Design a protein with these regions (language model features):
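Vicinal oxygen chelate
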Residues: 1, 3, 7, 11-13, 17-68, 88-93, ...
Length: 105
């Protein structure tokens, strides 16, 4: 994962990029930097995206409108909004076009 994409996801998820991360393998540590806590890893693959993501992340927020604005400031692109009687979400693309949803919590 290129460093800009690593920084994007670290900011979205409130995490830190591990110092030993590379452009091929990125580790996101908990926000407090505790290496013993749960980590998220991203591995770069050589193939370009040609179809729907193989993994789709849903980010849930109690402050949906504020989080939407924050994601847009980070560089996310709004793709579509979905509103129902009891649910609301927006599908975004990250800075490389990978899709994810923000769900009102």
């Amino acid at each position: 994962m290129p460093p800009p994409l690593a920084r994007f996801w670290a900011d979205v998820l409130g995490r830190q990029v591990a110092e030993d991360s590379t452009s091929e393998h990125v580790v996101l540590l908990p926000g407090d930097g505790d290496a013993s806590g749960p980590r998220i890893t991203f591995n770069k693959v050589p193939e370009p995206k040609t179809v729907k993501n193989r993994l789709h992340l849903d980010v849930v927020s109690d402050t949906f409108d504020a989080e939407t604005e924050r994601l847009l400031r980070l560089g996310a692109q709004r793709l579509r909004d979905v509103q129902g009687d009891k649910f609301r979400w927006t599908t975004f693309a990250d800075i490389e076009g990978n899709e994810f949803d923000l769900i009102a919590g």
